[in-house]
């Protein structure tokens, strides 16, 4: 039988708690983003869709997520400095189509850039919700309504 020291037990419990919080953040942000803004379609052949059920109190997750992840807050479009008064959280991306991880993050826009972004209707068969423009994928906007209809009929 394996015995844990108090320190090992504390570290294990902290790791488990952090993992639960991370999963809740990921699912809560995804649910919020799908319901309120534009999702991006990318070439993803896995067809795997994340489970977004069972999340009710994502304000707590949003607060936790922003405090830990947004140290340098600038608009993803124009690059202006953001604060709580002009910040709009717009997209998250679930990494992991290739390596199996499920890290979530969100792109921030100022009010004016967020209002000027225009979604286009595209095929939502293969998708991953995305945030930052990165070099490995070409981002094609998808309307939220089309994606919600695809997910929930």
Annotate each predicted stretch with a short phrase:
Residues 9-15:
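Long, low-complexity, compositionally biased polyampholytic IDRs enriched for Lys/Glu and Gln/Arg
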Residues 24-71:
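Short, charged surface segments at domain edges that flank catalytic/cofactor-binding sites
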Residues 72, 83, 114:
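Core catalytic machinery and nucleic-acid-binding channels of phosphodiester-processing enzymes
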Residues 98-105, 117-153:
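Polybasic, low-complexity binding patches
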Residues 67-73, 103-106:
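Short metal-coordination and nucleic-acid-contact micro-motifs, chiefly zinc-binding Cys/His arrays
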Residues 80-106:
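Histidine-centered nuclease catalytic patch
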Residues 75-78, 110-113:
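Short cysteine-rich clusters marking metal-coordination/redox-active sites
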């Amino acid at each position: 039988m394996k015995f844990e020291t108090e320190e090992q037990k504390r570290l294990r419990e902290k790791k488990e708690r952090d993992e639960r919080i991370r999963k809740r953040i990921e699912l809560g942000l995804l649910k919020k983003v799908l319901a309120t803004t534009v999702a991006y379609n990318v070439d993803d052949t896995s067809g795997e869709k994340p489970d977004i059920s069972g999340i009710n109190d994502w304000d707590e997750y949003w607060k936790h997520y922003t405090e830990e992840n947004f140290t340098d807050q600038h608009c993803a479009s124009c690059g202006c400095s953001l604060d709580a008064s002009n910040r709009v959280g717009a997209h998250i991306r679930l990494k992991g189509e290739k390596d199996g991880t499920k890290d979530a993050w969100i792109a921030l826009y100022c009010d004016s850039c967020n209002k000027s972004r225009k979604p286009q209707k595209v095929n939502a068969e293969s998708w991953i919700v995305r945030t930052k423009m990165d070099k490995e994928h070409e981002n094609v906007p998808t309307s939220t309504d089309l994606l919600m209809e695809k997910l929930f009929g």
